[in-house]
Every structure is written in structure tokens, then in C-alpha cells.
């Protein structure tokens, strides 16, 4: 280091100052002038030194005379000469070299950890000495901790401990920081470039098909991008340039592990087994948590994650963290995977994936995952509305930018298909919005509660009492305890079917549904925290909605799609990778509208059992034990009234089935089509009731106020059964009946009330449910018809005794018949209603371009404790109950074995998009 400093730089000082080289003191041949310079303060000496030299003297003689003279001033002159030389050297250094030396010591650039000395130092000792150069930290220390270039680092001397390089040779070495080109070479970063529509994949040599990257930002609430998008330039550009949905609906419960595993399997938690971050399996007698070794037991993981699908079909996968990816599922790990370690820097994860993308073709994965814990971690700690969450959002936006810049460096930014996604949203917690069951139950020592917004309850003594515990008694004890109660206890088979949270032994038989922002625990000591962020609530709540952005050559450019569920993403990724999906809960083809070139063309399922005829019979009229009001128009001549011509039947079909007849996909049921003037039915001769009934209500249709509760007419097209008689239901406190097509509906001025009073239009119905059914038909149906300019209605019974969301087989139904009054009767578990209208309310249901739907799957219960109806008017709770139990058309199809809209002309993929839509409402904000 000495050679660089001014103190040891005499030779460089001479070069810097001109006077020492050119002055007389350096010229030994000009002795007189030299002496004069050495003794300028002595007049006599000066005079003698300036006297002309006697050129006639020989040098030797002159020298001899000088030696003998021994002038005493000689030593003074020599001293002065030496002083002048030293002074000249110093001045030369100061005035001639000062700029050069100062320039060297102001910066550590090129000097990091070298033991040189100067005005400032750049070795490790400078910190203790307090004389580090001003840029020591940025130039020498930060490169060990940061993954990017900045102006301090551009052109740096290569440092062995830096995470990436910004030196001039980094491109040759292949270790440049991701942003080297934009920061140090003036090129534009990915986010600075304009949007471009990538019509065809533009891939480097060796990439036969575009790779797919699934990138999760845990806990990224959909609303974050709506509110803070201006602070998130990279994600906002992906949204603008790619395919985006304002909300992606997670699965219930809205927790991390269940949702991440649903995304990669296309299955609901009840199907793939990961029903929560914490759970107990009574058959395994084992408990699962994210911090236990049990997490690595493959027995917990059902279904087929996409890296297993890829492996089966000859593709490779690389996962840098994803729930389940570090577990040997079906005997398979991803080809490259990392054991989860939350301390691994985000940048290291991104660089690893970029390095995997550079592997040789035969080693390189086709499918990749990335996972970041933010903004979930900050949301939990500080709440969703906090400066810390904003910082976390900006941080992950920078990470996405790092990825995109890295892809650009590899020329993969027009090749790779990116899915940027999150698992769920985030809600603000409050200690005042926590419910404790010990307040209601007293002694709770024998009870275990999994706390949170989707709480569950089981006995402490497991597995012995897991199945025999009195869950129903506790549910009854906790129902309707307070006005405006913010939680509802549910036996799991009564939960809204849209949640798909029942068919698993890992889901305790007793669960709790909570209002937005509310949580539940056994007592205050059993919950972790109450005032920070949380998630897990109903998956339709606005603050639980998740992020989805698709970008790359496989996705459409610059579109915003309607909300869809994350179970659809598995099929989407399979399409991007040209894989055949494993069986799953998604609807393959429902996201075709996101893709530029869909590879899968869906088709309507075929009806597996043809319709049979229900001919008129000449059986004698039977006494049904009914008492009809004389004002009701009776059916005098049944055959005349219902023996319709082909032309009449065509008109009726057009008016009652404008979108086609529901196809029956149940293999065993014998179904015949019954046509009436105002409605049509698909009647099952096996279960003695209609599977469906369809009719249309116009905006101006009138409804009668007549009471039809004890009036039936025999339908001579169907053999009469005791369950079709009024006498069977009279004074029966357990069960009554209801009409599928409402007798109150009067579409003609002359009135044809009696058609809806046929024995083939009734279904067994609990009296408590009749309250809901009547209010819907008398009040809500008219309201919806007015709001939507008419609606088509299809309704019918549901049988889901094993609560798996699928229609039960006829064999199972035979085992579920109940005996009432010595007569077998099959009582539905639910009833469904499908309302279809036009998106454009200036159109009528019979002439729709684009359809709008609203469907319900209503639990058929013996009481209305779910709604705490005591002292309430029907108007205050029935519609709220319907909205809680709304469902997708797809959910209705699965649970009934029916298929809708098969006669619509638009592509089947558009029909599937309609069927998988679930309406949302403002009260869930």
C-alpha cells in the first residue's frame, strides 16, 4: 500500500512537479548558479558566487587552490542546497501530486481488503481505526449481502465473497448480478420495456416447449394489488400485459398448506387430505403440523401433484419449496427439490431457478415452483393494513422483477409461462372479536378445539371417543345462544356444499362457521394472538381472495377474467405442459378463455340412460284423502288436458326448457319426461319423485294467494304410491310435502292452478323447511323475476347421505329409505334451485345472448336452528340463508347427477366458465 501513497512517492513527486527536473539545483555542471541558489541570504557569498569564472585556469589547479583555501562558508552553502532540495521535493508532492493521491484515497473501488495506507483505508481494520473510505460499506461489504448491482459496484474489482459480480468480466464468467445490464450497461430492465403480445414462444436453442413456472407469494391478498398497485411496478406490468383475475377464490379453509396443495392437485382439501395446517387422523391416530416430522409422512398426502403427473408422462420438475414437494408422494419426489428452510434468502431461490433453467437439456426441468413467505409473514405480524406489509409487497415485487430480468438475460422472457399466484388473503384480527367456548360450555377439560376462523371440535380422548362423542348435543347447546351470534356450530354435513368440507375423517364432525373478522377458541390461553393478521375464513369473503396473474406465450395478452377457483389451476398447468391431468375436482376446459391456443376441447357428457315413456293408464281414480278448495280449477278430463300435440309440446319445451332439458347422468335411474302447460319434469320411477322440474317466471307473471297445502290430483301417467296421498301426510309431525313447480304461479288469465297440484310435482319435505320453500316461491322468486326481467327455474331433490358432494347411487339410496307409517319413503338431504336469466336485463330468458346464473343447494333440516329464527320474520333470514348456501352450477351437477345447458350454441368451454362461476355479494366485504 505504501507505493500508492504520497509519503512514499518521491519518484512520482518528481514526475508531478516540473521545477525539480528543470531547476539549476539539479544541474551539477552549473556550479556557480547552484551555489547562489543554496545561499541566497549571504551577500558576500552571493557576490563571490556570482563573480565571473576565470576560464583561463585549469580545473585541477583551481580545485587544488579551493581545497587549500578551506572557506568556512562552504558547509553553509551545502546545507542550504540540501534544504532547498528537500523543500522542492515536498512542494512538488503537495502541489504537483495532491490531486492524484487524493483521488486514490477517496474511494475503495479496486482496493477492497488491500493493506494500503492513505487518507482512508479499505481493509477490515479501518472500521476499528475509524478511517474507512466513505464508500467502504457499499463497495466492499454490501456485495457479500446483496444480489444486485448499483453504481458503486459497476466495474468493481472481483470480490471472492460477493454473492454476484458487477465486474467488467462478469458476463464472461457467467456470474453477473441479475440487473447488471440495466444498471451498469445502460440497457432497459424488463419492467421498463413496453408491453408486448407474445404471439408465439420465442425460446433459445434447446427449449422444444416453453417451461412453466408456478410462483407463490404467500398471503398476497387480491386487494393489495388493487390498492397498492402503483407501488408494485413489476406485478402491475404483469397484470397489464398478461392474463389477470381481480380475485382468485381459494379453497376452504383459507390456510396455507390446504391451498398450496389444492393448486398443484386440483383437489379440494377433503379429497387431497391436507384439510388444515394442523389436523388429526383418527385412523392413523397421528397429528399433523407444519413443525412436526409427521409432515413428511406420505400417508397424509392424497391425490397427484403436478410434479408426479409430469414424472409419469416423461417431464421433469424442479421445486424451490412448495407444500408437499419435499415429501415422497406416490414414491416420487420432484427431480430437483429443496427441503423447506425459511431462512434461505428470496434472491437465492430465484437465482437457483434461473440456474436450473440453464442446465443441459436432458437435466433441465420443464416445470418449476417458487415460494416466498411474504407478504403473509408481515401480514400476520402487523396486520394487512400496515406500512410493514407495504414494504413486504415492495420487496416481493422486487423479487418478481429480479426473476423477469433474469429471464430476459437468458432470453427466456418470451418463452417461459409464468403463473404468479397466492394461496389466500389476510384479515385484520381483533381481541374483541374472539369467541371462547368455555363461556358457553363451562367444563371443557374433555374437549379439544382447533382454534381460528374455521374452528373444529373433538374430544380429548382420541381415537377411542372420536366417532362416539356427542357432537350433536354440543352443537345444539351452542346454537342461538345470543342475539346476533357471530358463530354457528355445524355438524359438518350441514355446512354449505360450496365449501366442500365434510368428506374426510380428518375433518372433525363438529365445525364452526364464523362471520368475517371473527375467530373462535376453547379459552383465551389456547389461542396464540388475537390482534394481528389472520386467515382461514369463508373463501368467498373479500379479504380472503387471492392473486392470480398469468404471463407468457401461452396466455392471452392484456385481459381481465372473471373470478375462478384455484382448483382449476392444475388443469391449466397441465394444458400449458401438454400433460393429461389426473382425476381432480376442477372442470377441465373452464379456463380455456385464458389461453391463446387451448389444447383441450371439452364436450358435454352424454346421457347414460335413455328416457322412457310414461303412458296414460286407465286406472280408476283413487281417493287421495285430500280436500281441495272449490275455487281451484279441477282436472276434469286428465287425458284431454295432457295429451299434447307435437306442436304444443314444442312450444312448452321452448318456454319451460329454453336452454335444453337437463341430461341425467345417473346410470341406474329410470326417468320419464312429463309435460304440463306451465312446467316440465324428469320423473324418477325408482325414487317416486321428480329429479328435476323446470319452468319460467316472467317479470309480470301473477301469483295467487290461494292455500294449496291440502290438495292433490292423481297423475295417471305414473303408478300411484301411498307417498302421493294427502292421507299419508295428515297429522304427520315428521314429514310433509312441498311442490317443485309452485301452484301459486298463474301464467294464463284463465288459470291452470291444478297442473302444479299433480302427485308427480310433490317431494317429501320437513315442515320446518316448508317455511323456507314457501318464502322463496311466494316472495323471492317474484323479486328475482322483476330484477332480472324474468328467470328460468330448475329445482329438485338432492340425495347426498355420504356427504361427498356427489349424487348417491340407487343402491345406496335403497339403504337410506325411512319407514313412516309402515311405508318406505326416501327423504332428500338437500334441495337444489338453479335460476338462469340474461346478463342483459333488457332481454328475456327465452331470448338470451349471455346467461347469468344463481344456484342454491339448501340443506333439508328438521329445524331452522341454523338461522336462529325464533321471533324473526321470514324476510330477515330466509334470503340470507339462501345466499350462504349458494353454489356453482357445477356443484349442483355433481350432487344431482344432472347436466345443464346442453342445447346452448356457444362453445362448451364458455358453458363451463358459466357453470363454475359463483356470485359474490357486498355483505361479504
Curated annotation (Swiss-Prot):
Enzyme Commission number(s) of this protein: 3.1.4.1, 3.6.1.9
Activity control: At low concentrations of ATP, a phosphorylated intermediate is formed which inhibits further hydrolysis.
UniProt disease link: Ossification of the posterior longitudinal ligament of the spine: A calcification of the posterior longitudinal ligament of the spinal column, usually at the level of the cervical spine. Patients with OPLL frequently present with a severe myelopathy that can lead to tetraparesis.
Listed Gene3D superfamilies: 4.10.410.20, Alkaline Phosphatase, subunit A, Extracellular Endonuclease, subunit A
A molecular function (GO) term: exonuclease activity
The organism of origin for this protein: Homo sapiens
Effect after changing residue 120 to R: In COLED; impaired homodimerization
Name the record gives this protein: Ectonucleotide pyrophosphatase/phosphodiesterase family member 1
Ranges annotated as spanning the membrane: 77-97
GO cellular component, one term: extracellular space
Result for mutant: residue 538 to H: In GACI1; loss of nucleotide phosphodiesterase activity; no effect on localization to plasma membrane
Region (Nuclease-like domain): 654-925
PTM sites of type Phosphothreonine: 256
Motif Di-leucine motif, residue range(s) on this chain: 45-52
Record region (Disordered): 1-43
